Amino acid sequence: LPKHGVQHRIPTTGFPVHSQARRLSPEKFKVSKEEFDTLVKLGIARRSNSQFSSPLHVVPKPNGEWRPCGDFRRLNECTEFDRYPIPRIHDFTANLAGKCIFSKVDLIKGYHQIPVHPDDVPKTAVITPFGLFEFLRMPMGLKNAAQAFQRLMDSVCAGLDFVFVYLDDILVASESEEEHVKHLTALFD
C-alpha cells in the first residue's frame, strides 16, 4: 500500500469490456501520442496486453488545446458503486462563518497521485491507434474516482479543521493573515 493507504479499486461484474481504436485527425494523433509517451515515461501508464479496452477520447481544454483521455463509459456501466461520501458544497458554509482569508489549492494531476490496485490495472486499458495502454495511477473518467480521491484527501487532511476538500479543490479558510500563514504551513508540512 502507498504511504497514504489509498488505492483505487474497480470492482466489476460481467465480461471484460472491449472497444476498437477510434481514428484520429493528424493533430489529435500527435497530441495523444505525445501525452501517452509522457504518461509512460512518468510511470503513470504502461503498454498493455489486457483483455479490457476502452476507446481513446480527445476533448478540448478551456485553452483550446486537446486533452486525450479514456472513454470509460462502458467500463463504468459494469463497475460497482463506491458509497464513500462526497461532501456537498453547502455542507461547508456553516464552517466558513467568520473566515475572511482564503486560499484555494489546486493539485496538479491530483488523480494520478492514487495508484490503481494491481488486480484492477488491466481494467483501465485504453486502445489507441498507436497501441494499448493501461494506467498504474488513477485516470480521470473512472466511476468512483471522485470517491477514491475524497478518501485520500480526507486521510491526508485529517485533523486540519481549517481545510475544506471538495473533489480536487482544497480551500484553506482563516480568520486572520497570521492564522492563515500557520494554516498553510500546517497543510504543506
Tell me the role of every PLM-derived stretch.
Residues 1-189:
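Retroelement reverse transcriptase polymerase core
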